[in-house]
Amino acid sequence: MTVDNSQIPNLNQPESFADLWDGYENVSKATEKGVLLLKDITKFFKKRIQSEDEYSKTLSKLVLKFEPMAPDGYIGPRLKNTWDQIKLETLTHSNHHENICNNISTHIIEPIEGLIVDLEQKMKSIHVDAEKSFIHYQESVAKLKKAKQNYDRLCKDSFEITGVSKGETQKVQKRAIKAAQDVIKADKDYRAQINETNTSQKQFLTELIPKIMNDLQRLEMVRIHMVKSYFHRYFKSMESTPQKFNTETENLLNLINSINNEDEIQDFVRKSKTTHKYPKPFEYEPYLDRFTTPPPPPPPQISSPQLLSPRGDISIQHSSSSNSLPIFPTQHQLLSNKEKADNNITNSLSLSSDSLQTNLNNGNNGGNGNNGSNTPTKEKKPSSWGLKRFSTSVSSTSDRKLLNKQIQSIGLAHNGGNIFNCKIEDIMVAQKKKYPYLEIPFIVVFLKHKLVALDVFKTQGIFRVPGNVVDINSLKKRFDEGNYEVAPTENVYTIASLLKLWLREITEPLFPLTVYDQCIENSNKREKIFEIISSLPILNQKTISYIIELLQECGKSVNVEHNKMNFPNLAMVFSPCFLRCSHTDPNILLGNIFKEKEFVQNIIEHFKPLQVNDSLEGPPSSSSSSSTSINQSSIESPPTSPLRSSTNSNANKSSTPIKPSSPSQQQQQQQQQQQSSTPSTPLSSTTNTNVKHNILSPIVEQQSPNNGKQPIALTQTYSHLNIGSVPLIINTVNNNNQNQNQNQNQNQNQDQNQNQSKQPIQSSNQTQQQVSAPATPHTVAVNPKINQIKAETITTPQKSIGDGNGLIGQSPSAHLMSPSEVKRRSNAIYLEDQERCKQRIDELHTQVNELYSDITTIETTTYFAMQSSLLITKLTKSLESFLTIDMWNLTLQDIKEAIEKNKFVSPPPINFKIPSKMPKLSPIELVQNEQSSELLRSWLSNVTLTVNRINEYLCYLGGVVIRIHSPDTLFAISNLFTDYDLSPQQNPKFVSLTLEQSTIFIQKTLALLEPLNPFTSDELNINVKVQDTITPASFSPALISDPDCNSPPTISNTTNRLLNTSGSTDFSTTPLSSSPSTSSTSLSTNNNNNNNGNRNLDINNSPTIVITNSSLNKSALSTNNNNNNNNNNNNNPTTKLSSSTSSTSTTTTTNTNTNTTTNEKIAHAIISPSSSTTSFKFDDDEDEDEDLLEINNKLHSQLTEELKKKQQQYKQLIFDIIDMIKDKKKLMNSLDLTNSDSQLDIKSIAKLSLSLKRALDNFTSESGFDIEDEQDPIINKENDSFVNLKIMTSHFISRIVLILTTILSISNEFNSTLYQLLLPFNENNNNNNENNNINNQ
């Protein structure tokens, strides 16, 4: 009996969407939901930006507009300093939330919106291709249907004519001949159409569907990978947040790092994969006359379980030979043949198409004699892209419906293997055929070992914390359907809840209702409890023992430290699972709770479990205990339902396990084996295709009688084998411990004596060979499943084979396996090293591509560009030497084929086109000079090809790392990236190179950029050969660089109503700093009709102002009384201010109406610029002059008021600038990037922001303000240039707000330089607002 290899899953090959050949509709819906998820993410983060922005503004206004009642003068300078720091911390908190808004917009919202557009376009293209493929297949099936109908019609006519032709006229005979000829022709057409349809079906299933599914998988891989990278970059940018946010950020980073697009795909495939097999090819169905049939014989006895198919249908076997069949089949034979035909095409496909459905329904009547009408069935509207199960049978569906009705009428419809809500005895009967030696329900064994695999004993709150209800119901449904596929990363709480659910839902509890009262009465009596257990059926006793053993291990003190579940806690949880009260009185129910707990607790603490055989394929061996060991490893792979049986009786016979021999026979065989001079050789690593060596294989239904094997218990473990690095045959037995292992080898030797000796595999592509020499008596065969995994190759051709010790020196092709298989075989340390190595590969991939984009698109120095290209080349050569020379002797073509074959996409193998634009390197003469420009083109070509090559290498290594289990190989790959830094070193000596120096530098660099292996023609022709490769796109400073970049921009009139700004101002005339003031100080007060706007008050940094009569007489202080000018004092408060970096000068406007006739006394007016107090001292040799004192007092009060007014204007100006620049940002975010006017507006806002930022940067550097370092935003090179311009402008605005708020928080004193710097921007904004108001009116 052979096994269809196409249906046997290859554990080495990672599962993909191509395995879901009948799941296009499911995958398509899942991909659409993935796009909806991206939209949900953007919607959520947009709302979060609004909240963060509002909160940031509220905190900023609280600090900046807070008016203290005690600004100064109170006791406690340290308290004042502390209070200032608290306000500054609040401002820092506000800036933090502002930074969050910027990071979310830059790193999440904008990239994901672009990704959504790209995914939707590509999904639309895939759907169009899928629809074409489906329609083509539909047409082929419709043609076959038509040919079948024509054949059946002609056959029917021929039979009718033949029946009346005897003894009739010659005309009737000619009609019969003509009808026979038509039948022959129709028969040929029918057969030809079958071949054509089968060809179309084969192409559809093996080429078109896999391509479509692979395209969808590629989109999903990209989506998950890109979203992960966006999240990662966002939270990486938040690492500089305050310490109180670090914990949450670190946890989120760990969760993000745990995202693996390949694991996500594997989990989806595992949950979506059905047990349907490929539909069999269309078969020729001869015409059967359904009209002339005698009455059917009595129905056969179908009580035998062999008559039930795995899907619950009836498989009726007819015992009559072909010779005894009548000419026309009976109704029963028709039913049997029809059922067989249906079984042959079970698990087939069906297309949801209007045309096909109509054809199928309308054509059914041609071959159905029970219904002569041609009434079509009601059409059903198909789904958009629904590829459902479609049938390869073109016969009528009414026969199947009739058969199903007959099955239901006689009560034979099977429920498909329900294991919940049924009796435990029924489960044992149903699974007896597949697992005859299993003493307890299979579901208990499976769940227990799954719990052990998920480290149940170290899980806090296990059995107490409930699992996810949706996941529990999903697993329950799948288990009832016979699908035991469970993800390796399934939540342990879900599995634990499923075990409790099964115990609660079985029809009769393990302690039946008849003994419930006894259990309650003797809850504290151990002997009585043990008697009650011994009185139970043996099946109940062993099931209880199997579960109690798990609970006892869980309640050990060593494990309780971690899971917090001691015996009382476990008893409280499991008492409702073991006992059920039949009473409905709430008082009785509540009163029995503690007694139930006490009863179960006594069982867990003191009951000694019985020995239970959990072997799936044979009785327990004599050398091992039949009781289950908790600490042994879990199930190798998910099994199928034990309730499913084979449809073929022969298959059932072949799947019957080998009966154990008697003890005497075993002793005789053992003695013969010990006396034999030629011991049996180990099993070959290549397995027979007729045998599936998986302990719990989903397809283990048949086993060749020539390949018997030792019954393997579920708890058997192979954790001592290092699959990736050990030879296929392991010497584990020596002369000292040979006797200890005799019992373990006994059953293997019994089976091996029946087979020919086989030698181990010598290479990955060899087949089974005969052993020329006997093996040593110390060789022990590796598990056949492991041999099968190791023997199969799935990837790159093996260039050379090393010494066989691991992967060192040989290609990893023979050892690649699915990531889930690697995780299952690995311990925590190996997985941690693997994750660290994979993360390092991803980081280097990101750094290389970002560095390449920087040196080819952003303005930089020649030295920086050359150093960066040398670093990239050095890393490339290191990887190239490792892959092509030192390690595996691969070629670049081998690597590309491996990437394509195994679908390596993490990190993605990006290929850049060679840019057509020259890089922006300084000096700019490089591009203008002919010689240097040619050198630059050669350098640009070499760097691009090198980056493409290193992307291929990193993609290959990233895929290999997660698919191998070899510590040596992982260590060798990790050493490649140890302490490797891709950050170019800056050297101030080479910042300003001349044209000649730069040319020489490029020449020397070019000589070092040559790869180890020359570039191939495909690589050199990358621009021609690959049309959809990536070109590095980034933010272009040219969009906002103008000669007058320091001047505010002119914004288009189209959006003046939105911008509230128009016109332009030339800021080149605005002085950013004034000349230093002289040592003398003059206080001037002028009242003049012609100079009302030029009243200046200059105060030097000197702490005193000396006012004397002589200075007054010399007009050092001049006061002109003019009452006519009093009304003009406040007409023009704007004053031209000047200051220097070394002194503080204050300019104000003062108007006095004071009589200056008394100039006889000398007065020293001491005014402190940092305080509002003023004291006057008069010379001792002069008399006090009250008039002069009054003048000075009034002057001081006026100066103080003007200073306060200027401080208010100064603060208000900063607030206005902050509000203005934030409004510009809101406006920019609301503009449509595709509109030309909006693009002009964005450029204008960018110019304004850049000019203001540069001015503030110069001011802070000259004034010595301590502003936190600027961090350049991360630019996505694939974005549009205006998208990147928008990102940079947002960064400029955030920097402006940060500088202004920090300056204001450090010092509230009036600063004339900053005032002069900001005033033109504010005036320009006010003028634009006025113009807009006029235009609107």
UniProtKB/Swiss-Prot annotation:
Protein localization: Cytoplasm; Contractile vacuole
Main location: cytoplasm
Organism domain of life: Eukaryota
GO molecular function: GTPase activator activity
GO biological process: signal transduction
Coiled coil (UniProt feature): 830-859, 1189-1219
Disulfide bridge partners, by residue number: none
Keywords: Coiled coil, Cytoplasm, GTPase activation, Vacuole
Entries under Gene3D superfamilies matching the protein: Arfaptin homology (AH) domain/BAR domain, Rho GTPase activation protein
SMART domains, sorted: FCH, RhoGAP
Any matching Pfam family: RhoGAP
Segments for region (Disordered): 279-328, 345-392, 612-689, 733-781, 794-821, 1041-1102, 1114-1166
Residue stretches making up the F-BAR domain: 14-264
Bias (Pro residues): 293-302
Bias-annotated ranges (Polar residues): 345-358, 1047-1063
Residues the record marks as site: Arginine finger: 464
Domain Rho-GAP: 422-611
Low complexity bias (residue ranges): 621-637, 645-687, 734-772, 1064-1102, 1114-1159
Gene Ontology CC entries for this record: contractile vacuole; cytoplasm
Functional summary from the UniProt entry: Rho GTPase-activating protein involved in the signal transduction pathway.
Xref: PANTHER family: FI04035P (PTHR45876), GTPASE ACTIVATING PROTEIN HOMOLOG 3-RELATED (PTHR45876:SF11)
UniProt name for this protein: GTPase activating protein homolog 3
Organism: Dictyostelium discoideum
Gene name linked to the record: mgp3
